[in-house]
Amino acid sequence: RHGTPRALADLASHNFVTAGAVAPGHEMRFNHEGKSRVLKMQPRLATTTNESAVAAAVSGFGLTQQMLYKVAEPLARGELQEVLSDFEPPALPVHVLHREGRYASRRVRAFLDLAIERLRALPELRA
């Protein structure tokens, strides 16, 4: 309806769906050619969960900014389209932490090894 945005200025004519966990204060963060930009917007819909923001975007309520693993399935099914990929913010690292001091028990170590293996296997988490 509003066309596909190709530059940040194109976002002015679009509706937005925000999620509290991703866009505190209704902001979207972008990075282009090493420069960070923060755009404040008035969302058409503000949700409290990423899942509801994705569902709203799939239903046509507007654009949403989400981590790739949250939208991998709707993208693969053609329900969503990635836009402004040249303005994507830098990737965030994934950390697996444990509380047990320097050395983990065998059970914790086994869980950590499994979690790390599975996380590394997800293409959505690779930059």
Roles of regions detected by a PLM:
Residues V94-A104:
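A bilobed periplasmic-binding-protein/Venus flytrap-type ligand-binding module shared by bacterial periplasmic
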Residues M67, Y103-E117, P123:
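Short amphipathic alpha-helical coupling segments at ligand-binding clamshell hinges
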Residues R1-V94, R120-A127:
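C-terminal regulatory
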